[in-house]
């Protein structure tokens, strides 16, 4: 029985690890070279088929909507020097807006340092041509949209070049203005204290003699560079790619490979489009009541684009009209994302066991609210899970204890039957039946617990709360490997102790393989996040205590019965 249990554990570990690696090949970081593209002032959308056309609109501007026949033709407009950018700073966002088109081309997160040893250097989410190309674009296209005009994208003006949310100020509005042909445009950004989402609103004041019509578009544009927020070195990188919402599929991934194969087009009521990376997400969220055309594409420079175009906005002469969308750029906070739009919280990707992982994270959060330390919270959570599964674990340990008790009898059977495996198997089954031992008794409890353990793995790997979270002493970041490999070595030691408590396999080859397992697993765990290794150490330690207690209890009962 113990041999089967051992083989099952090893097989599950190997299959799980290989499965994770395969999942990352399909949905993880793209193994592509970084595209160091120069700063672009173009807006989102249609294919670059007319990229050389004279007197045409920007190459990135999409058609008005899925059914419109007024698609803009491309024109590359000159890049704007960084000195011309409009800088905006709140308590949680530090960003730059390009006056050409009004795109958000740089964005940093002051509360999230890029590295723990450099708390003064914030993590940079958007970057237009520095280390990578990643920006949020938006504009007005369609019949009269200024972003679809032959002269190129509009150049906005602002009253200031720098805006900062003052102490005691909860809301800040940044207005960019542009006028043409009797129509006055305001591109308004509204920021609020403590929020990573901002509202982008277009105000169209039509003072011309003609009716005005246009469509709002918004998109995220990114090159193929690797994930700058990824910290694992085990091959278990989380998903890097696009995602969107549909009524049939509230969380639909669109990987770079999917975009390489061709455009994805959807028509949705409300919805959202997003770009995901480890710990952080950026998303455009349109009007929930509007029917929006969502599409993805890859431009001629190798950039990946996902965006939407809203229904036509019509403004009569002498009237005003408004259209808006929300941009989120920040950490994967489930509570915040759920409030912004249905399904957006699923971008915290716990994999196919998300329905188990979410309650585990909820419990972990509540424990942290009491203890204030994520390391101790992991320990308490592990104890609670171990206690919950104690009846199942006890059944497994009892089965192993009985196997340990009959080990001398198994050795005697081996001497009697030698290399005759068939007779040996028959004799073993008769012995199990006589001693009332279930050969699968140690395996089934493990199978039941595996989904919970895998879910906890993804919770610890995916949750932004673990990023740069300290525990004690040398563990200053639970999301990266133990810098001195102390926890993995302790984990290997606990596996060795567990092995000593188990009955020795009758097959010498199996016994040799089992002796190697602590060394093999220690090697694997050297590069695992410290938070995950901490969980495994605590889990193994509790298992040793439970197993030792039950084994002593059964052995004492066996000796008493023998007397």
UniProtKB/Swiss-Prot annotation:
InterPro entries: Membr_insert_YidC, Membr_insert_YidC_N, YidC/ALB3/OXA1/COX18, YidC/Oxa/ALB_C, YidC_ALB_C, YidC_periplasmic_sf. One of its GO terms (molecular function) is membrane insertase activity. Keywords: Cell inner membrane, Cell membrane, Chaperone, Membrane, Protein transport, Transmembrane, Transmembrane helix, Transport. Residues 43-62 are annotated as: Disordered. It is found in: Cell inner membrane. It is a multi-pass membrane protein. Its main location: membrane. GO terms for biological process: protein insertion into membrane; protein transport. Belongs to the OXA1/ALB3/YidC family. Type 1 subfamily. Required for the insertion and/or proper folding and/or complex formation of integral membrane proteins into the membrane. Involved in integration of membrane proteins that insert both dependently and independently of the Sec translocase complex, as well as at least some lipoproteins. Aids folding of multispanning membrane proteins. Interacts with the Sec translocase complex via SecD. Specifically interacts with transmembrane segments of nascent integral membrane proteins during membrane integration. NCBIfam families: PRK01318.1-3, PRK01318.1-4, yidC_nterm, yidC_oxa1_cterm. This is Membrane protein insertase YidC. It comes from Pseudomonas syringae pv. syringae (strain B728a). The gene is yidC.
